[in-house]
From Swiss-Prot:
The lineage of its organism: Viruses, Adnaviria, Zilligvirae, Taleaviricota, Tokiviricetes. It holds the Pfam family Glycos_transf_1. One of its GO terms (molecular function) is glycosyltransferase activity. InterPro entries: Glyco_trans_1 (IPR001296). This is Putative glycosyltransferase ORF378.
Length: 378
């Protein structure tokens, strides 16, 4: 008896699609991944997809630093993948496998970089980026135009020519990025027509590190709760995390005199940068664990901190935050002063905030730096 053996022919499909793995769904890592997908297509004409598990095609991983490094073997992270990681946890009691040192890890703040250095892992700092289009759109919407030529300020937004400089002035090659310069003649003070005194967007889990309860207590002490809008998971807040459209969020940010950011610790912290991108100043704890994108801003309001205590996360055991030690009456007074100053900001002040962000934290600036670490191409 003769057998006719048929050998299957493999169907090999080659694709230029760039695969990004996000650490979770409907979270900050997912949001960063979706923005990367949008702007790598806009500025480089590269199509990418966002996945939520590791695959052989993964080129970029956007996730929590401790989670990825501690599970580097179980996750089967491809050797060619670029890890763009950060974390709000200052310490973990789990061991990081030694082969994690085989990866170059990009992170978003100096204190996160210090963690990696102590672990013996090569690292570089590449900050997160905001939504360029919405930042320009809603900043331009709040600008007041005036024909008084003696007081007109002529500014170019997002072209990198601003004199305002920040801590992370990433200077990667952006020659292949299409410029989108918006010129606006502006004058006057736009603070009088703001809808809210204070806005806060506090995303994330219910582990308390965003200090939602503290902010509510401060607003009550200053009788500001009725003139504030809060996004958080608590029932006392006005909207749930990730429930707003991008237009609703940026409209909200642009209609506030002050953005409150009282988080204990952040790998980076996108919401306060989004607020500054539309000219809204930020009040925050004076802490190395939160002030990476804030400390060099032309206008910001630090609240006094008298040290830190290590606080274990109630939701993820073995992970710890750096909780600031403060005097409540003191920070209430400083918060009140911050709002008073924010109320008197001029358009020129708000332009400075907007340009600081566009120069340092726009995708037009950040993507060339990522490209460099991804082998020079996406």
């Amino acid at each position: 008896m003769k057998f006719h053996i048929i050998y299957p022919k493999p169907n090999i499909v080659y694709t230029n699609m760039l695969s990004v793995t996000a650490g979770c769904r409907n979270c900050s890592f997912d949001y960063v991944s979706s923005l990367f997908k949008k702007y790598v297509n806009k500025y480089y004409n590269v199509v990418s997809n966002v996945e939520y598990s590791m695959s052989l095609s993964t080129r970029l991983v956007i996730a929590d630093l401790w989670y990825v490094l501690e599970n580097i073997n179980a996750l089967s992270v491809p050797s060619r993948a670029v890890l763009w990681l950060d974390t709000a946890w200052v310490w973990s009691n789990r061991t990081v496998p030694s082969n994690a040192r085989n990866y170059l890890v990009l992170t978003t703040s100096q204190w996160n970089a210090d963690i990696l250095t102590k672990l013996g892992i090569d690292n570089a700092i590449v900050p997160r980026a905001i939504d360029d289009d919405y930042a320009v759109k809603y900043f331009n919407n709040i600008v007041v135009n005036n024909n008084d030529d003696d007081n007109v300020i002529d500014k170019k937004h997002g072209d990198g020519d601003s004199e305002v400089d920040g801590k992370f002035n990433v200077s990667g090659d952006s020659s292949d990025v299409t410029s989108n310069v918006v010129t606006t003649n502006v004058i006057g003070d736009v603070t009088d027509n703001k809808k809210y005194d204070v806005v806060a967007i506090m995303t994330g889990s219910s582990d308390g590190h965003k200090n939602e309860q503290l902010l509510l207590k401060i607003l009550d002490a200053l009788h500001l709760r009725k003139t504030s809008f809060l996004v958080c998971a608590l029932p006392q807040c006005d909207a749930k995390p990730f429930s707003l459209t991008d237009d609703e969020k940026y409209e909200l940010l642009s209609q506030s005199r002050l953005f409150a950011w009282l988080s204990e610790s952040e790998g980076f912290g996108i919401p306060p940068v989004e607020a500054m991108s539309v000219g809204t100043p930020v009040v925050h704890f004076d802490s190395i664990y939160v002030n990476t994108p804030l400390v060099n801003a032309p206008i910001h309001f630090p609240l006094s901190v008298h040290g830190f205590k290590k606080r274990e996360s109630p939701t993820v055991h073995g992970k710890y935050f750096a909780s600031p030690v403060y005097n409540f009456d003191e920070i209430v007074s400083e918060f009140k002063d911050a709002l008073s100053v924010a109320t008197s900001l001029t358009v020129k002040d708000r332009i400075a905030l907007h340009e600081y962000v566009m120069r340092n934290y726009s995708h037009k600036v950040i993507l060339p730096e990522l490209k460099k670490y991804m082998g020079g191409s996406f």
